[in-house]
Amino acid sequence: MCQGIYYLINNQEVRSEFSNPRACLPVRIKGGALAQLPWGRRRQQAGNLPLGGWARLDAIYSGHWDRWRPLPVKLEIRQFMERDIEERHCWFDVTPGKWIQGLIAHWQQERRVYVVTITPEMDDALYERWPRILSDSVVPRT
């Protein structure tokens, strides 16, 4: 479910977990610059956007997020941390050339970014959810 992230911004390393109420995610904005936006919303945080830090892809497709004017974005994350079904933490590298999909949600002046997640297709998957990892280029089949 992507509980932690590692990225570089302005040549500074950032490692954070969702449990930190000040956690931000690196969003690639128009023009190529990186911006840091608040990662989701926690119970103790004021606001009207959804609680949590993740947006299920099937919920996006079903229109659940429409009321928050969702905007798909690229998250420039180098590593992410998942907690498996036995509560063990494991860090995973994001392959160069790939990126994690995010969603910016809006409510009046409030903006937060959520990690888009998918459900693993394998019956014996160790993780309940996985970040949606995409690529700018499509490799032709040979």
Per-region residue spans from a language model:
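Short linear sequence motif anchored by a di-proline
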Residues: M1-T142
